[in-house]
Amino acid sequence: MSEPARLISPEKRGEDLDITLRPQSLDEFTGQAEARANLKVFIEAAKNRGEALDHVLFVGPPGLGKTTLAQIMAKELGVNFRSTSGPVIAKAGDLAALLTNLEERDVLFIDEIHRLNPAVEEILYPAMEDFQLDLIIGEGPAARSVKIDLSKFTLVAATTRLGLLTTPLRDRFGIPVRLSFYTVEELELIVRRGARLMNLPITEEGAREIARRARGTPRIAGRLLRRVRDFAEVARAEAVTREIADEALTRLLVDNVGFDQLDKRYLNMIAVNFGGGPVGIETIAAGLSEPRDAIEDIIEPYMIQQGFIQRTPRGRVLTAIAWKHLGMQPPKDMEAAQFRLFQEDN
């Protein structure tokens, strides 16, 4: 059964849109130091030349700050910010309406650009390259091509699946930026900043406990902080301590590494039903009754980054870390079998 309301899902929810908790500048933004440093240079150079910033593509798992960075870029460039997403732009007319309303150097943000309609994508190419729209007006013998000049704008796009972008689209982004999961130390700073903006007293240990369970994702850290605040207020606690954070998150079924029941079902299924793997993604999706995309985009990235599973051409394989987390003993021949598997695959 699908679980759209998972507390630790990195996907956006209404409560995550609290603009008061969002950083308003690159200096306020915590984490992604290399990306921020490069963006500062590109923004400053574009401002000095009085030109539109080159098109930017953010790549990375959900919840790492792609939308926030796009908004900050527009603010630091001193231009307007327009936002949409790939699935919303259903036809060429929708894209034309967006592009023709942009002013000089404005930022247009397209989230989930990998889900853009292929027919719309074709229209986007000349818009990005030549700042022109090539539209076909009418049908049949009466059809004619019309060129519309556009203001020089900056397209900032975000994707969780770089491999799903066509090569022509990918090549038109002059500034590719890959975002990675945050460290516990970075998330602790984010939690403490959020608590300060909420006027919520929190101890260093309390902030770290929330950060440890946030799966390397600021959006999840903010959501966990809100739920822990609820427990602290009802308990009339003077501050969020490690004990309060631990009790709240344990009651919410978020374990000490940030896994919930769905994550545990995933690991348990591979361990119990398939002896630790390898097992194919389609089999896992069927066993969990979850879409393949949700598993690849939401469940697996953090597990892979933390070393709980490995992706191989033959399927997913549990690591020793995963077996230890489950409190199970791996099959005696696991190491030898996995060694043979990796040797054959290489």
UniProtKB/Swiss-Prot annotation:
Compartments where located: Cytoplasm
Protein name: Holliday junction branch migration complex subunit RuvB
InterPro entries, sorted: AAA+_ATPase, AAA_lid_4, CbxX/CfxQ, DNA_helicase_Holl-junc_RuvB, P-loop_NTPase, RuvB-like_N, RuvB_C, WH-like_DNA-bd_sf
EC code(s) of this entry: 3.6.4.-
Oligomeric and partner information: Homohexamer. Forms an RuvA(8)-RuvB(12)-Holliday junction (HJ) complex. HJ DNA is sandwiched between 2 RuvA tetramers; dsDNA enters through RuvA and exits via RuvB. An RuvB hexamer assembles on each DNA strand where it exits the tetramer. Each RuvB hexamer is contacted by two RuvA subunits (via domain III) on 2 adjacent RuvB subunits; this complex drives branch migration. In the full resolvosome a probable DNA-RuvA(4)-RuvB(12)-RuvC(2) complex forms which resolves the HJ.
Keyword flag Hydrolase: yes
Spans annotated as Head domain (RuvB-H): 256-346
Biological function: The RuvA-RuvB-RuvC complex processes Holliday junction (HJ) DNA during genetic recombination and DNA repair, while the RuvA-RuvB complex plays an important role in the rescue of blocked DNA replication forks via replication fork reversal (RFR). RuvA specifically binds to HJ cruciform DNA, conferring on it an open structure. The RuvB hexamer acts as an ATP-dependent pump, pulling dsDNA into and through the RuvAB complex. RuvB forms 2 homohexamers on either side of HJ DNA bound by 1 or 2 RuvA tetramers; 4 subunits per hexamer contact DNA at a time.
Keywords: ATP-binding, Cytoplasm, DNA damage, DNA recombination, DNA repair, DNA-binding, Hydrolase, Nucleotide-binding
GO BP annotations, alphabetical order: DNA recombination; DNA repair
Protein residues bound to Mg(2+): 67
Family: Belongs to the RuvB family.
Region Large ATPase domain (RuvB-L), annotated ranges: 1-182
Gene3D superfamilies: 1.10.8.60, P-loop containing nucleotide triphosphate hydrolases, Winged helix-like DNA-binding domain superfamily/Winged helix DNA-binding domain
Region of interest: Small ATPAse domain (RuvB-S): 183-253
Gene Ontology cellular component terms for the protein in this record: cytoplasm; Holliday junction resolvase complex
Gene field: ruvB
SUPFAM superfamilies assigned: P-loop containing nucleoside triphosphate hydrolases, Winged helix' DNA-binding domain
